[in-house]
């Protein structure tokens, strides 16, 4: 269900929330992955929606503010500031001054949000966003805004500095804050810093990112808009079953939906058949590290996987063929972990057009939908891409998140692409999925 998403939010209070217990003053080093371009200065935002119909008398802002103070004892870097070192890398100064907390009130009820299917500028009111030109040393590593609606429901908008945590780390933090809100004494998963495991002098992934930036000229897309499309679990399972009958191979939901979106975007952009297209997606590398990183590690540990194909082959071949290309790219990271991330890949594609590159990110298992502040799990989770700077490695990308509770097993695709191809992209997606769903 779509909402009008036109509403007004009034800020009631803006305060710094310090840890409930004194934290040691110190400078903490970030890892090589934390300091990568496209990561270190990036801000990622999450919206958690709660209907809260059964505890209307309880003030969520008060509960969450107190929980924030308690959880910062265990996550003290979020109560500090980022600082630039002489070599240009960032480090964290644990000052103990706290995270920024904002209490706000909307002039309507939650129905205005619908299922958060489409982006609206009004949604940015649910987050506290600094001007785009704000220096990295002046930002708050963590901002939490609680916006109450007239029906008693509320939205928690959280902005994380990507240099301190990745998506899994952010989910771990929010789950811990929920535990504090529900009266737990300490987080169930102990947070671990240990960024020294990835030493700054290691070439771990740094070369790959710099190399990628060098071969990609500035985009000519211009404006990028945010949209969404939900693929139901029934549709996904139907396609997976068809591919299994065709090949006797298991295909994951991510592989199937990524292949569909890659084909649909390529066709919608009408890229010449003689050119190549590249798909880039992220994979968690915690289990690949030797020894494996502890569960509580919340720093960046995501690797970039690349798959490339010729446009003519991509569009004329079968869906199974594209799924296999994605599978092969995933296996390459598992099998060649060290060599893949330390040395440049052979056969680099310096001539590929920037517009022919698309990024994918799977946010379904980060734990955001499990965050419980005392009102149960979030009824809906979404993202608003409002970063400080345009430092993304790719401008056109897709993020996979869980749909609202009424369709928990499907995939909601958040798309970021030129406005001129939004309709054609959705048309191509529907055409392909219908071919499998209506198959006799």
UniProtKB/Swiss-Prot annotation:
<feature type="active site" description="Proton acceptor">
    <location>
        <position position="372"/>
    </location>
</feature>
<feature type="active site" description="Proton acceptor">
    <location>
        <position position="162"/>
    </location>
</feature>
<keyword id="KW-0808">Transferase</keyword>
<dbReference type="InterPro" id="IPR050898">
    <property type="entry name" value="Plant_acyltransferase"/>
</dbReference>
<dbReference type="GO" id="GO:0050643">
    <property type="term" value="F:10-deacetylbaccatin III 10-O-acetyltransferase activity"/>
</dbReference>
<keyword id="KW-0876">Taxol biosynthesis</keyword>
<dbReference type="Pfam" id="PF02458">
    <property type="entry name" value="Transferase"/>
</dbReference>
<comment type="subunit">
    <text>Monomer.</text>
</comment>
<comment type="similarity">
    <text>Belongs to the plant acyltransferase family.</text>
</comment>
<comment type="pathway">
    <text>Alkaloid biosynthesis; taxol biosynthesis; baccatin III from 10-deacetyl-2-debenzoylbaccatin III: step 2/2.</text>
</comment>
<dbReference type="InterPro" id="IPR023213">
    <property type="entry name" value="CAT-like_dom_sf"/>
</dbReference>
<dbReference type="GO" id="GO:0042617">
    <property type="term" value="P:paclitaxel biosynthetic process"/>
</dbReference>
<keyword id="KW-0012">Acyltransferase</keyword>
<protein>
    <recommendedName>
        <fullName>10-deacetylbaccatin III 10-O-acetyltransferase</fullName>
        <ecNumber>2.3.1.167</ecNumber>
    </recommendedName>
</protein>
């Amino acid at each position: 269900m779509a909402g009008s998403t036109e509403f007004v939010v009034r800020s009631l209070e803006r305060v710094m929330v310090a840890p409930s217990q004194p934290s040691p003053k110190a400078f903490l080093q970030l890892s090589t992955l934390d300091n990568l371009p496209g990561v270190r200065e990036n801000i990622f935002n999450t919206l958690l929606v709660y209907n809260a119909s059964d505890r209307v008398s309880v003030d969520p802002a008060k509960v969450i503010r107190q929980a924030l103070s308690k959880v910062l004892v265990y996550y003290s870097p979020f109560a500090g500031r980022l600082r630039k070192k002489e070599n240009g890398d960032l480090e964290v100064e644990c000052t103990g001054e706290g995270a920024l907390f904002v209490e706000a009130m909307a002039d309507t009820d939650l129905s205005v949000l619908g299922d958060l299917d489409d982006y609206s500028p009004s949604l940015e009111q649910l987050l506290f966003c600094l001007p785009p030109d704000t220096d990295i040393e002046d930002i708050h590593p963590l901002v939490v805004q609680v916006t109450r609606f007239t029906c008693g429901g509320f939205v928690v908008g959280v902005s994380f500095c990507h240099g301190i945590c990745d998506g899994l780390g952010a989910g771990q933090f929010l789950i811990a804050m929920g535990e504090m809100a529900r009266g737990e004494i300490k987080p169930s998963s102990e947070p671990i810093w240990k960024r020294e495991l990835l030493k700054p002098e290691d070439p771990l992934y740094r070369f790959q990112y710099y190399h990628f930036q060098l071969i990609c000229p500035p985009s000519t897309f211009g404006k990028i808009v945010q949209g969404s499309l939900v693929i139901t679990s029934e549709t996904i399972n139907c396609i997976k079953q068809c591919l299994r009958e065709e090949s006797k191979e298991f295909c994951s939901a991510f592989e199937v939906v990524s292949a569909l979106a890659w084909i649909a975007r390529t066709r919608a952009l009408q890229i010449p058949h003689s050119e190549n297209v590249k798909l880039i997606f992220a994979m968690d590398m915690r289990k690949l590290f030797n020894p494996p990183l502890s569960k509580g590690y919340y720093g960046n540990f995501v690797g970039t996987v690349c798959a490339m194909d010729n446009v003519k082959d991509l569009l004329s071949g079968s869906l199974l063929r594209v799924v296999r290309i994605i599978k092969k790219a995933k296996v390459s990271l598992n099998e060649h972990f060290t060599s893949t991330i330390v040395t440049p890949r052979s056969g680099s594609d310096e001539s590929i057009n920037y517009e022919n590159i698309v990024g994918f990110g799977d946010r379904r298992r980060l734990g955001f939908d499990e965050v419980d502040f005392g009102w149960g799990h979030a009824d809906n989770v979404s993202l608003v891409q409002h970063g400080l700077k345009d430092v993304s490695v790719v401008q056109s990308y897709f993020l996979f998140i869980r749909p609202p509770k009424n369709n928990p097993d499907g995939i909601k695709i958040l798309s970021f692409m030129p406005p001129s191809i939004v309709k054609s992209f959705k048309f191509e997606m529907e055409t392909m999925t219908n071919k499998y769903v209506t198959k006799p």
